[in-house]
Amino acid sequence: MTRTPAAPEKHNRDSASRYKSGSKISTLFAEELVERSAIAGFGRKDLVVFDNACGTGAISSALHRALGDEKTRTWKLTCGDVSEAMVEVSKQKMIEEGWQNAEVEVVDAQNTGLLSDHYTHVFSAFGKMLGTQGNGIMLTSISAFNLFPDDKAAMEECFRVLQSGGTLAVSTWCSTVWATLIQSAIASIPGDLPTPTTEDIFGLYNKNWADESRVRAQFQQAGFTDINVTSVKKEYTVPVQELAEACKISLPHITRKFWTQEQRDSYEAEVPKAVLRILEEEQRGIGLGAMKAEAIIATARKP
């Protein structure tokens, strides 16, 4: 398959560094999702994989590491995202990592236009939103199925494009340290500001993917069988400044939903300061904190 030309450079050094650091937590969950999909043990035929709402390509990258050359020499990988900017990022990663037999294209997860009964595996992990922070482009990670305006249509598309016996693997957030820190920071600021609940934050666009029972129900309603749903935690240590940066990236999406414009103008800039103050008080001069999150991992089979 013809390799795609390199994507234009869109990050300065500072923003790229912060993006790479913040993407580690998503990478850990991508590896978990790939492992739980059992794709490494698939032996019936050549793999045909769709990385749905691929974002920065974390799943496709994890797949290459897990499967190795023996399987990727003969597989077909399609990476799709509705965001042209995310497609460019994934194309660049494809070039840098030498993905085999892969293509990256703009695809609407709710109406993919892809072949029916075609893929052995469909993955849908954490989606990415682009935003600006300082002088660079920044990304925030939100569950792809929380982003879809019509999540039922997206599930129907996953079911349609899978072969009989094919596997769908999905991950969604259920708790993150950056959401908790934002909540604490807002509550600490005078002004009686609306403080969204955890369910509010992870249900910004729809609330069907915030807990295990709801996720299981979505798979059942779409017609899947052999449904496995579990929650998984990941954690690693980072400088407190990185935790504060993670909050900055997500904050505008939260305040846009739950605050008035007047509240945003008056108080939004105070939230990162409050986050850093909370972290420094908690760590008592150590300067390190825990980047931690919990995600729902779900896999199922098309009959």
From Swiss-Prot:
One of its GO terms (molecular function) is methyltransferase activity. Its cofactor is S-adenosyl-L-methionine. Its EC number is 2.1.1.-. GO terms for biological process: methylation. It is an enzyme of class 2 (transferase). It comes from the Eukaryota. It holds the Pfam family Methyltransf_31. CDD domains: AdoMet_MTases (cd02440). Gene3D superfamilies: Vaccinia Virus protein VP39 (3.40.50.150). The keyword Transferase applies. Keywords: Methyltransferase, S-adenosyl-L-methionine, Transferase. Belongs to the class I-like SAM-binding methyltransferase superfamily. PANTHER family: 2-METHOXY-6-POLYPRENYL-1,4-BENZOQUINOL METHYLASE, MITOCHONDRIAL (PTHR43591:SF24), METHYLTRANSFERASE (PTHR43591). Non-reducing polyketide synthase; part of the gene cluster that mediates the biosynthesis of the bicoumarin kotanin. The non-reducing polyketide synthase ktnS first catalyzes the formation of the pentaketidic 4,7-dihydroxy-5-methylcoumarin from acetyl coenzyme A and 4 malonyl coenzyme A molecules. Further O-methylation by ktnB leads to the formation of 7-demethylsiderin. Then, an oxidative phenol coupling catalyzed by the cytochrome P450 monooxygenase ktnC forms the 8,8'-dimer P-orlandin via dimerization the monomeric precursor, 7-demethylsiderin. This is Methyltransferase ktnA. It comes from Aspergillus niger (strain ATCC MYA-4892 / CBS 513.88 / FGSC A1513). The lineage of its organism: Eukaryota, Fungi, Dikarya, Ascomycota, Pezizomycotina.
